[in-house]
Curated annotation (Swiss-Prot):
The gene is adkA. The lineage of its organism: Archaea, Methanobacteriati, Methanobacteriota, Thermococci, Thermococcales. It is an enzyme of class 2 (transferase). It is found in: Cytoplasm. Its EC number is 2.7.4.3. It catalyses: AMP + ATP = 2 ADP. Transmembrane segments: none annotated. Keywords: ATP-binding, Cytoplasm, Kinase, Nucleotide-binding, Transferase. It comes from Pyrococcus furiosus (strain ATCC 43587 / DSM 3638 / JCM 8422 / Vc1). This is Adenylate kinase. GO terms for molecular function: adenylate kinase activity; ATP binding.
Amino acid sequence: MPFVVIITGIPGVGKSTITRLALQRTKAKFRLINFGDLMFEEAVKAGLVKHRDEMRKLPLKIQRELQMKAAKKITEMAKEHPILVDTHATIKTPHGYMLGLPYEVVKTLNPNFIVIIEATPSEILGRRLRDLKRDRDVETEEQIQRHQDLNRAAAIAYAMHSNALIKIIENHEDKGLEEAVNELVKILDLAVNEYA
């Protein structure tokens, strides 16, 4: 039975670090898929774009088609290996927040778990300010909290359409990273029995 875990978190929360460390420690052999990368690969194959930045400019209908292609590909991969899908629950746009996974995509992926990585707004803001390599939006602590609240609401909507369990993992500055990694490993290890 396919085992799919969706992992989300706003920029600066530590999602990539936690994911990398958890994948090194889990007993299950997960395949990590970045949903946006898979969509981009599909768009390049179809001759729609050459660069990642062009993705945002594609018509919404085309973007939805690319999302479905990516979801179907992930569903096929999940027949062989457990899959960890790195994606955004919500995406901040200049016009408002957009759901990262539309209804049809969630139904197709049918995740077992939706994991949200969170931290306090002040911790996230501090991490963003220290990470000068990344080009990130400047947000206030209030805006960061709103984005995290919207991610929780999106996760609930996704779970309603897939029967997934929601797991919120907190990644705090004071000894939080190790605890966060261990919590994710516990979830990932549940896949071992599915592929035995």
